[in-house]
Amino acid sequence: DLNSMENTIDDQTSAILIEGIQGEGGVTPATPEYLLGLRKLCDEKNILLMFDSVQCGHFRSGRFQSYQRILEDIENTFQPDAISMAKSLGGGIPIGAFWVKEKHSSLLSAGMHGTTYGGNPLSCSIALTILDV
């Protein structure tokens, strides 16, 4: 609920991280109103809205990302600030990725964000093929 979320934000809050569709909690999608409300709240508070799309990204919801599925019937320009991705990105081959809007890219510099899957040529080749499909 947006009121509870707003009441938990303080001057130490830098981001909100959510799953657009909770996979482990019973495949429960967020409502369009909630996602749009979170975007507005994050913009007002100058904090990042981040999505965990490990479970429900890459067409598992019928759209490239879960928020696109949830908001498909609403005219909007919604976009999260960052998205974590894995699992279906590699079609069963281990890979993970972290996407961030260009305006926030300066928050990460070389060496600040590492990965145990980073740079694997097989995984990267498969992920590029999946993204091309």
Q: Where in this protein do the model-derived segments appear?
A:
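Conserved N-terminal phosphate-binding loop of PLP-dependent enzymes in the Aspartate aminotransferase
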Residues: D1-V133
